[in-house]
């Protein structure tokens, strides 16, 4: 490596003409973090000896699952060797975005902070549904789009075929699609030169009152909330009083700086720059993502175009396995919420599982990751109940109830029930088209249309109830398409539905943890599945236990757990049959009495196993 050059990017108040803000949009596993690693290395801000894979993914769980969850940002120096700006010292801000469907909200924030984006597509797989969704978001924001094929070093890569596919989608020429390899570094410097040439410089009024947009905030144990901002107008300096425009709260900036690639303190931030602000606030909800920061005195009048607050789509109960971990769970969720503004929670009690929390998530992956982080980072053992969505129930008297939890389902007659629906896009290889359409139909999907992206890849569009997707749709889709399908969905309002609440009764008593709201057609299937499952999982008692599934007072499925019997005749060697009968009658009476007063204890493992979704 050449002698280490001075990182001039750590100096702020750069002339906006020399700044380029861009992000990378890609599907999971298309090599975005690897490309970001190469960019960091080539610009010289990370020395080879400090390099580690997925440099920007700080959470263990991100590195382990190979996905990016939080948007990270880095400020880099770059001197292009080609193009109109060859030889100029430019400053680039790379904002790394997550690629998963649940985190579309995080992507939309990162896009607001950029003027251009690199559309990164795996040269062996082609464009995926979620990448398409994020690409349309970028187009809505009028970003300059630079199409790139990654992983051209792979033996299975077919860059010519996929260059045509991308050109067809975004309307460029196939030869405009750049070819790079994040792994070997081939083509990366040409890509950065192209970014400098095509991405427009940020525009803003340097003399106007400051307006900075928050696009992320993270919680640091030592310094409180670190807020990442993009300056639109004016400038911010340290030791300055600032105001959050949505809440009106005022703070003082204790430290202001840039990430290059470690946080570096600077004098302040000017137009078009991306950096961080620390105010010593301890609550992330004080610095809401999408909010505008301005000066507390003589500040801006109008805030920047904000975002929508993220709305939870999926709800699930989280309960500690041992009741004494409840305070720890509360503390842990509060700490996670500091970093994750889209997580909502409220206390909940369950007869079967004790005290816990009803949490709202953006989607299934968000739920899984939150649970994994709670268990790993805070050392908790948790049970999560089956996920559910929000239903709107209109009762007979016209009053409305929002049902987030099966136990809130109103009794009596109901006039109308509405369930949330989503518009879903699935991209599958043509050979799996039949199996995929069959699956979507079985989940009450209505087809909206289909397009062939190339001769062997099809895009399907469906409208489908969200409740059908959250359970095991994704797993089934992957297994029917050998893992080649990709899926994206966005909310699309609600529709009337014929839904019922199925209760699972043990010895005539409902167990709230197993209740579910399902479509009337699927009620028998769910009832049979749960009763059979519980029959296997609950240990046999001294008396017979009926396991029933019911809709209201109507029983729709039943299994019996046979009683354990002691052999009362073992001491009778021969003798009169009436003696044997007397002993058996006595045992029968005892069992009857036990059944009347006995209660069934359900072991923890049975809850965990019964609530875990499976493929059947």
UniProtKB/Swiss-Prot annotation:
EC number(s) on file: 3.6.5.n1
Residues covered by the tr-type G domain: 17-203
Main subcellular location of this protein, as a coarse class: membrane
Function description: Required for accurate and efficient protein synthesis under certain stress conditions. May act as a fidelity factor of the translation reaction, by catalyzing a one-codon backward translocation of tRNAs on improperly translocated ribosomes. Back-translocation proceeds from a post-translocation (POST) complex to a pre-translocation (PRE) complex, thus giving elongation factor G a second chance to translocate the tRNAs correctly. Binds to ribosomes in a GTP-dependent manner.
Species this protein is from: Corynebacterium jeikeium (strain K411)
Classification via InterPro entries: EF-4 (IPR006297), EFG_III/V (IPR035647), EFG_V-like (IPR000640), EFTu-like_2 (IPR004161), G_TR_CS (IPR031157), LepA_C_sf (IPR038363), LepA_CTD (IPR013842), LepA_IV (IPR035654)
Disulfide bridges in this chain: none
One GO CC term, this protein: plasma membrane
Any one Gene Ontology BP term: positive regulation of translation
Name of protein: Elongation factor 4
Gene3D superfamilies in alphabetical order: 3.30.70.240, Elongation factor 4, C-terminal domain, Elongation Factor G (Translational Gtpase), domain 3, P-loop containing nucleotide triphosphate hydrolases, Translation factors
Top-level enzyme category: hydrolase
Location(s), subcellular: Cell membrane
Annotated signal sequence range: none
